[in-house]
C-alpha cells in the first residue's frame, strides 16, 4: 500500500512538471506585425522631450493602429537610455512582432513632423501620417494635450536634468499603469492614486507633469493589448532586479514599482502558503488535506522550476498561471482564508468568498487561529531563553487581548479584531504593502468573485425611512465569533440555502442555527432571537473594499 501512495505522490508532482518545454525553445513561428520604433542617437534634451510628447500623442490618438501604439510605447520606455539603439534590442527577443528601427534627427519647428535620418526606412507618406496622428487626439482629452496642465507640452527643455525629471515623471505613471493592466484594468484607480501620492512624496514624480486620467487609461489599454510591450517590460524588470545598491534613478524606480507587479495573479497561492503551511498548526494533519498538500508541494517545485520569470506569469500571459488557481486546492485554501481573517486585518478586504470556498474548513481555520494565536513556538522561545513562566505570561497576554480584556487603555477594553473606526480611536495609517494585493488577480482563473470597490447600502430605520447617515462597517470576524460548524448547503431547505456560507453578511444571520424541521431560530448560545427587531425587510450591509492598504 505504501508503494501505491508513493507512486501517487510522484505522479502528482510529475503531472505539474512534465509538460514544460526546454528553456529558451523557439515556438512555432506565426505571422508578425511590423512595428516601427524611433531611435534618437543624440542626447539633445530638446529633441528627446519632443519625442516624449510625440509618443504620448501617438498612444492617445484615436485613429492610431495597434502597431503605432506599440512602437510609441517601446520608444517611450527607451528614452532615458543613453544608447537607444542597443536598448531596443530587448524587444527583438519577442516572437510576436518584427521590430524596425527608424533613426530620427529631430522634428520640424513648431510641428510633430519627423525629420528622419538618411538610414531611416520612412517614406514621405508615413511621415505625414504620423504628423496627422499626433494631432488627432480624442475629444476626451482636454485642452488638446495629454497633460493636466496645458502649458507643459510647450515649455522649453534645454537641460538634461529637466528632461530626465519630466521623462521619469511620465514613465513612473506608465509603470504604475502596468501594475493592474492584467488583473484589475477595469477597476477604479484608487491604488494608482495612492502610489502616485507615494512617489510624489519621494520626489520621483512631479505633480506638474501629471497626465490626464484618460491618457493614463489609454496607456494602460495599449500595454494590456500588446504582448510585445509586456515582454519588453518584463526584461526591464529583470534588469532592475539585478542592479546593486549603486544604481541609476530609472532602474531604482523600476525596481520599486516591480514589487507591486511581481507575483500578481498568484495572491491566493501565496496566502495559502503563508497562513496554512507557515503557521504549522495541527489541522494540517487532517487526512482531507493530504492530497492537497502534495498538490502544493508540486506547485512550489513548479514555481522554482520556472525560474526568474515565474514572478511575471500574469504579465507574460503564461498558461502555467492556471496551475496555481485555488480551485485546485479548495480545502486547504478555505482553511488558510479562515486563519488569515483572524491574523491579518487586511484580509477583510480580500474577496476570498469563492464558489468553491468550503464553510467547514474556513471555520476550522477561524477557530484554530483564535485558539492557537497565543501559543508559543518552543524553538524560538528556547533561542530567546524564555522561562516557562515567561512563556505562560505571553500566552495569557495574547489570550486576554484577543478576548477584549485589555486593561489600562482609555475608553475601555480593546478588541484587536475590530477596525479602529469602531473603537473610536485614530485610524492607523498603513503603508502601501506590495505583498498584499487585490483579490482580482485570480478572478479569471477560477471564476471567483471579482474585486470590488467598497460601497454601503443605506440602513432602513424603523417605520420604513431610509437612514443615509454613515453606518459602521460590519466586522466579518466579529460576526463569526460564535458561529458553529454549519451543515452543508445541500442538506438545508431551499428557503434557507441563501443564508448559509455568507461571510460578513447580515448582523445576526451568520450566528443563527437552523434545524431541519423549520423551527424557530436560535443563536449560537441556544437563545431564541429576533433577527431583525426593527424591520423584517432590513437590507444587508455589504462590506467590500480595496485590497491595497
Curated annotation (Swiss-Prot):
The modification Phosphoserine is found at residue 439. Ncore is globular and carries the regions required for self-assembly and RNA-binding. Ntail is an intrinsically disordered monomeric domain in the C-terminus. This is Nucleoprotein. Homomultimer; forms the nucleocapsid. Binds to the viral genomic RNA. N0 interacts with the phosphoprotein (via N-terminus); this interaction allows P to chaperon N0 to avoid N polymerization before encapsidation. Interacts (via N-terminus) as N-RNA template with the phosphoprotein (via C-terminus); this interaction positions the polymerase on the template. GO terms for molecular function: RNA binding; structural molecule activity. It is found in: Virion; Host cytoplasm. Pfam families: Paramyxo_ncap. GO terms for cellular component: helical viral capsid; host cell cytoplasm; ribonucleoprotein complex; viral nucleocapsid. Residues 1-404 are annotated as: Ncore. Residues 1-398 are annotated as: P protein-binding. The keyword Ribonucleoprotein applies. Residues 531-542 have a biased composition (Polar residues). It comes from the Viruses. It comes from Mumps virus genotype A (strain Jeryl-Lynn) (MuV). The keyword Ribonucleoprotein applies. Keywords: Capsid protein, Helical capsid protein, Host cytoplasm, Phosphoprotein, Ribonucleoprotein, RNA-binding, Viral nucleoprotein, Virion. Forms the helical nucleocapsid (NC) with 12.71 N subunits per helical turn and a rise of 5.3 Angstrom per N subunit, protecting the genome from nucleases. The encapsidated genomic RNA serves as template for transcription and replication; encapsidation by N is coupled to RNA synthesis. Forms the encapsidation complex with the phosphoprotein protein P. Before encapsidation, the newly synthesized free N protein, so-called N0, is chaperoned by P.
Amino acid at each position: 500500500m505504501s508503494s501505491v501512495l508513493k507512486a501517487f505522490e510522484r505522479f502528482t508532482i510529475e503531472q505539474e512538471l512534465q509538460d514544460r518545454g526546454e528553456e529558451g525553445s523557439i515556438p512555432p513561428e506565426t505571422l508578425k506585425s511590423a512595428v516601427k520604433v524611433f531611435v534618437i542617437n543624440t542626447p539633445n534634451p530638446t529633441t528627446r522631450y519632443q519625442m516624449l510628447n510625440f509618443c504620448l500623442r501617438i498612444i492617445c490618438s484615436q485613429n492610431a493602429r495597434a502597431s503605432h501604439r506599440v512602437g510609441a510605447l517601446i520608444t517611450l520606455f527607451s528614452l532615458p537610455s543613453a544608447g537607444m539603439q542597443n536598448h531596443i534590442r530587448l524587444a527583438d527577443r519577442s516572437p510576436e512582432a518584427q521590430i524596425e528601427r527608424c533613426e530620427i534627427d529631430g522634428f520640424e519647428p513648431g510641428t510633430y513632423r519627423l525629420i528622419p535620418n538618411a538610414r531611416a526606412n520612412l517614406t514621405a507618406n508615413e511621415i505625414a501620417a504620423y504628423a496627422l496622428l499626433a494631432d488627432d487626439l480624442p475629444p476626451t482629452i482636454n485642452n488638446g494635450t495629454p497633460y493636466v496642465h496645458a502649458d507643459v507640452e510647450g515649455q522649453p527643455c534645454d537641460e538634461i536634468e529637466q528632461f530626465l525629471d519630466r521623462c521619469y515623471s511620465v514613465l513612473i505613471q506608465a509603470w504604475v499603469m502596468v501594475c493592474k493592466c492584467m488583473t484589475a484594468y477595469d477597476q477604479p484607480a484608487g491604488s494608482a492614486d495612492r502610489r502616485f501620492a507615494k512617489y510624489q512624496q519621494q520626489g520621483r514624480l512631479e505633480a506638474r507633469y501629471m497626465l490626464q486620467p484618460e491618457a493614463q487609461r489609454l496607456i494602460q489599454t495599449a500595454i494590456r493589448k500588446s504582448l510585445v510591450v509586456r515582454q519588453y517590460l518584463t526584461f526591464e524588470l529583470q534588469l532592475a532586479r539585478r542592479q546593486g545598491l549603486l544604481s541609476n534613478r530609472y532602474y531604482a524606480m523600476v525596481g520599486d514599482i516591480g514589487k507591486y507587479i511581481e507575483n500578481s495573479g498568484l495572491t491566493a497561492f501565496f496566502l495559502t502558503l503563508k497562513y496554512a503551511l507557515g503557521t504549522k498548526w495541527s489541522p494540517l494533519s487532517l487526512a482531507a488535506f493530504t492530497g492537497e498538500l502534495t498538490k502544493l508541494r508540486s506547485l512550489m517545485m513548479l514555481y522554482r522550476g520556472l525560474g526568474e520569470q515565474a514572478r511575471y506569469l500574469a504579465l507574460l500571459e503564461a498558461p502555467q498561471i492556471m496551475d496555481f488557481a485555488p480551485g485546485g486546492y479548495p480545502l486547504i485554501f478555505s482553511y488558510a482564508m479562515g486563519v488569515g481573517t483572524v491574523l491579518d486585518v487586511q484580509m477583510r478586504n480580500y474577496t476570498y468568498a469563492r464558489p468553491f470556498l468550503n464553510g467547514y474548513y474556513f471555520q476550522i481555520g477561524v477557530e484554530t487561529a483564535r485558539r492557537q494565536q497565543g501559543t508559543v513556538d518552543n524553538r524560538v522561545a528556547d533561542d530567546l531563553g524564555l522561562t516557562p513562566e515567561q512563556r505562560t505570561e505571553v500566552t495569557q497576554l495574547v489570550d486576554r487581548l484577543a478576548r477584549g480584556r485589555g486593561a489600562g487603555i482609555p475608553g475601555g477594553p480593546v478588541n484587536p479584531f475590530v477596525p479602529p473606526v469602531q473603537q473610536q480611536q485614530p485610524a492607523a495609517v498603513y503603508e502601501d504593502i506590495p505583498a498584499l494585493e487585490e483579490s482580482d488577480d485570480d478572478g479569471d482563473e477560477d471564476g471567483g468573485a471579482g474585486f470590488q470597490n467598497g460601497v454601503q447600502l443605506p440602513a432602513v430605520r424603523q417605520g420604513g425611512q431610509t437612514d443615509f447617515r454613515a453606518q459602521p462597517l460590519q466586522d466579518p470576524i466579529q460576526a463569526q465569533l460564535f458561529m458553529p460548524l454549519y451543515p452543508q448547503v445541500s442538506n438545508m431547505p431551499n428557503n434557507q440555502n441563501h443564508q448559509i456560507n455568507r461571510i460578513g453578511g447580515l448582523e445576526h444571520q451568520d450566528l443563527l442555527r437552523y434545524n431541519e424541521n423549520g423551527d424557530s431560530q436560535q443563536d449560537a448560545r441556544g437563545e431564541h432571537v429576533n433577527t431583525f427587531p426593527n424591520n423584517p425587510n432590513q437590507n444587508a450591509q455589504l462590506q467590500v473594499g480595496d485590497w491595497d492598504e
